[in-house]
């Protein structure tokens, strides 16, 4: 038997935590002698911190010594499938070989397994001195027959990932690309000793590997390396480019878009357009850049996006994969919670879970929160939101209320066009992972007319932190003011509320001058950003008659219900404005806005009548 202190050292937790687990009966075999807990030597650490009894080990759960950790941040295929819990996606290889497109582009949002899948393709196809078939012998692809196994280890491979090419200047960006090419050429130093390469080719190879090649020479580096590999191995290589659009996003945001587009156009053209030294090509990214902007004339490019049926189950986790994972870790009882938070994406016709969030959720003791929000910031989003119209602002509010919005989705987005046409925001939000398409119809021009909605609770939280923060910072409503409004509502302090709204109006002159609707949009977004966790927010706008009511229905009975009746009219005196606010307050009672809350058993209901005229505001409460 061991003491709590000894077990704490073994489990890397505090003695107090072990003592608490013993008290709650979560450690099997623990006994209390003379005021201290004693624990069996072989007692395993409980995995789920919220399981409340000693029978926490599920029937199908493997013993602790056999449980593999989850691959958080692991994009190395060999390591992932050897050392970690690996969700088998090798049938992607079969689907590809059944169709054999010459060049494939996969577009998915960040953290959906793109890099891991591309490294899997590299390991599968690449010629190696080692026996790499062992990394696939127990995988699904190996059971598909010799016609697929015969491709394993038979091709030279060029592999580049641009996922970390994130710099503020073009000079720094091209230096990083030069370094990546130096590393990739370094993986193929056998070419320097090849009797099938000319001295001229070896001289060029040396310039790349010594990082002395200029920008023009770098543009032909993929094409020339593919030719050298094909000559040496008598087999055209496979070229894999992961996260191809990361430096393009940076170029757009940091004002070197022309330089990066010019470079990439030549770089990819040499590699993929009419290259007889290419067996197959793969690219991944977030956005599908219009072909005329970077893949000009590349007629052999097959694009697979979230709208397509092909490959729909290979990026992200399917429902059956998630159920198997939950069972493996003994937390099948968390299925509904996990589904509510991280399910809801639709890739083609397949329902998909966010893989990054799922593995973080399980590894963090099944604690539901927005894990994906911290994985990167899409600066393009800020650029689009900066020119968002009132209509788009209102639709974002509707989305946050759980409604569906009809939008045109154009997958052929050119970065530079985003700011010119704010309606493209929906296309961007979809491919970036912020929306799903429950319903879609293909149009004659190749775009889709879709019903879009927020996939799950995590993305609702992401909207508030990433998207709504833009409005909180750029004219709709300041975060400080939004906090004051929320606090004054909770406290039923009409004077403080009047002051906060007045401050908001003073600080958002241009936004407010766009019309009264703009004021309400900003106010509603601010309320949602700060109060949606505690309240379901419903609104009823009567266009044309100058009124707008808002009901904040508490999600838990311990919070008061809140009803706002807002009215506006031009050119009112202070006396008239006060009368108008009292009329608004009176209307709440006359129209029985509180009936729904009372029926739900909410006894404390705060009511506010708010009137404004120009830059003046008056608030009254019961």
What is the role of each PLM region?
Residues 1-17:
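Polyanion-binding surface elements
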Residues 71-74, 165, 172, 176-219, ...:
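Conserved P-loop NTPase mechanochemical-coupling segment
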Residues 63-129, 133-144, 396, 504:
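Walker A/P-loop-proximal flanking segment of P-loop NTPase domains
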């Amino acid at each position: 038997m061991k003491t709590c202190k000894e077990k704490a050292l073994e489990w890397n937790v505090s003695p107090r935590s072990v003592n608490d687990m013993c008290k709650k009966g979560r450690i099997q075999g623990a006994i209390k002698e003379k005021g201290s807990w004693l624990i069996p030597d072989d007692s395993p650490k409980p995995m789920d911190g919220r399981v409340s009894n000693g029978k926490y080990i599920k029937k199908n759960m493997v013993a602790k010594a056999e449980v593999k950790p989850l691959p958080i941040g692991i994009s190395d295929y060999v390591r992932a499938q050897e050392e970690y819990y690996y969700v088998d996606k090798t049938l992607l290889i079969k689907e590809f070989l059944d169709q054999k497109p010459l060049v494939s582009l996969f577009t998915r949002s960040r953290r959906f397994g793109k890099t891991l899948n591309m490294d899997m393709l590299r390991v599968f196809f690449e010629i190696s001195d080692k026996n790499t078939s062992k990394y696939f012998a127990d995988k699904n692809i190996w059971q598909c027959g010799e016609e697929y196994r015969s491709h394993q280890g038979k091709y030279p491979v060029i592999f580049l990932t641009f996922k970390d090419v994130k710099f503020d200047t073009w000079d720094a960006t091209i230096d990083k690309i030069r370094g990546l090419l130096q590393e990739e050429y370094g993986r193929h130093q056998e070419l320097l000793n090849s009797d099938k390469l000319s001295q001229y080719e070896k001289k060029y190879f040396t310039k790349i590997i010594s990082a002395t090649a200029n920008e023009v020479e770098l543009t032909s580096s993929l094409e020339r390396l593919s030719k050298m590999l094909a000559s040496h191995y008598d087999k055209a290589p496979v070229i894999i480019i992961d996260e191809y659009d990361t430096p393009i996003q940076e170029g757009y945001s940091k004002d070197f878009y022309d330089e990066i587009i010019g470079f990439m156009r030549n770089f990819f053209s040499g590699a993929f357009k009419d290259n007889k030294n290419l067996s197959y090509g793969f690219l991944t990214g977030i956005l599908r850049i219009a072909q005329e902007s970077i893949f000009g004339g590349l007629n052999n490019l097959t694009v697979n996006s979230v709208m397509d049926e092909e490959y729909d189950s290979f990026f992200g986790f399917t429902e059956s994969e998630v159920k198997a994972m939950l069972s493996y870790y003994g937390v099948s009882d968390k299925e509904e919670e996990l589904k509510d938070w991280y399910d809801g994406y639709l890739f083609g016709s397949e329902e998909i879970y966010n893989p990054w969030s799922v593995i973080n959720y399980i590894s963090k003791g099944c604690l539901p929160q927005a894990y994906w929000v911290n994985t990167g910031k899409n600066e393009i989003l800020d650029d689009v939101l900066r020119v968002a119209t009132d209509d788009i602002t209102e639709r974002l509010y509707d989305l946050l209320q759980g409604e569906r919005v009809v939008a045109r989705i154009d997958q052929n987005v050119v970065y530079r066009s985003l700011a010119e046409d704010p309606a493209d925001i929906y296309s961007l939000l979809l491919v970036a992972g912020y929306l799903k398409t429950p319903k879609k119809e293909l149009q004659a021009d190749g775009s889709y007319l879709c019903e879009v909605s927020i996939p799950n609770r995590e993305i609702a939280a992401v909207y508030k932190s990433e998207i709504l923060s833009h409005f909180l910072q750029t004219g709709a409503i300041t975060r400080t003011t939004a906090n004051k409004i929320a606090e004054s509502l909770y406290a039923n302090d009409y004077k403080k509320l009047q002051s906060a709204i007045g401050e908001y109006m003073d600080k958002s002159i241009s936004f407010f001058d766009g019309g009264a609707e703009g004021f309400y949009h900003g106010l509603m977004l601010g309320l949602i950003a700060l109060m949606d966790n505690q309240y379901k927010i419903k609104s009823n706008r009567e266009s044309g008659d100058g009124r707008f009511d808002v009901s904040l229905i508490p999600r838990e009975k311990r919070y008061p219900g809140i009803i706002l009746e807002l009215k506006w009219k031009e050119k009112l005196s202070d006396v008239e404005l006060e009368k108008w606010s009292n009329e608004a307050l009176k209307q709440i009672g006359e129209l029985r806005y509180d009936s729904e809350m009372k029926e739900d058993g909410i006894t404390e209901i705060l009511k506010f009548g708010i009137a404004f005229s120009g830059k003046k505001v008056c608030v009254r409460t019961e």
